[in-house]
């Protein structure tokens, strides 16, 4: 079986002298691994293709009784122009990539995840000074794709719109309530969200990476937003950032 697939390269690893395995993200197949036999030597079949973060059109064959994916050839569609030479921006991209790989999406979200990853890389490649909150906004959006980020437009208890008065995020319940309804909610871990932090949560869901790069909230609002997202990710997805990577919490 042979097919053509556009994919984003997440990782490339050598497993023999001239052979590599390649981790790919496809809008139709999600994340999968393929072998590029001779890929580290061939200039004709994979010219300029096999680098992480490249966007490539591959011809793929499935072979063997286990249905291994083998890359027959590739055509480079686009690649970051500046990202790899800017450590701060590259660090943000790697942070986003590590979270994405730690929390695989369901088949119904493959196309959304692919589009989000492409937009993330494109934005970080072009933005001179992206917001320090950019990776956290990406994390919140991914949590939303998993169905684990609470709606933030109205109180989950009384239904009233949430606004400048802020809100309270009830972590275990995965919902946001207005301050007046906090007493009516069950116990557990609560994270306060002021009006600006609540707006950041809305931005993570309703806007995209290009808008996130320009976010410059008050530091206190950034801390509130950061704490709420970290608590939600830890409780509902079982992930925490430790020593340069995401681990099971």
UniProtKB/Swiss-Prot annotation:
Keywords: DNA damage, DNA recombination, DNA repair. It comes from the Bacteria. Disulfide bonds: none annotated. InterPro entries: ARFGAP/RecO, DNA_rep/recomb_RecO_N, NA-bd_OB-fold, RecO, RecO_C. GO terms for biological process: DNA recombination; double-strand break repair. GO terms for cellular component: bacterial nucleoid. SUPFAM superfamilies: ArfGap/RecO-like zinc finger, Nucleic acid-binding proteins. Belongs to the RecO family. Involved in DNA repair and RecF pathway recombination. This is DNA repair protein RecO. It comes from Solidesulfovibrio magneticus (strain ATCC 700980 / DSM 13731 / RS-1). The gene is recO.
